[in-house]
């Protein structure tokens, strides 16, 4: 992700928060719809999961939120 100078983590999170709606997620990210579609393809290849499956999407989003909280806690402790 860092090597490609893109934020695939944030892209996936916004996509999931927008209930897998490409148009709404692209608007939220202020990027072109095709750019989002390309990033989602990269994400699918990296994680090898069906991000459009409702159960998978819920699990991913829950994990991402827990990860974000954990990172915030670590920053506070420093």
Tell me what each language-model feature is.
Residues 1-78:
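Cytosolic nucleotide-utilizing catalytic cores of signal-transduction proteins
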């Amino acid at each position: 992700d860092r090597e490609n100078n893109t934020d695939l983590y944030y892209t996936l999170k916004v996509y999931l928060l927008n209930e897998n709606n490409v148009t709404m997620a692209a608007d939220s990210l202020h990027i072109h719809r095709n750019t989002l579609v390309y990033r989602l393809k990269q994400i699918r290849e990296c994680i090898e999961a069906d991000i459009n499956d409702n159960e998978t999407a819920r699990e991913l989003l829950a994990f991402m939120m827990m990860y974000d909280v954990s990172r915030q806690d670590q920053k506070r402790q420093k």
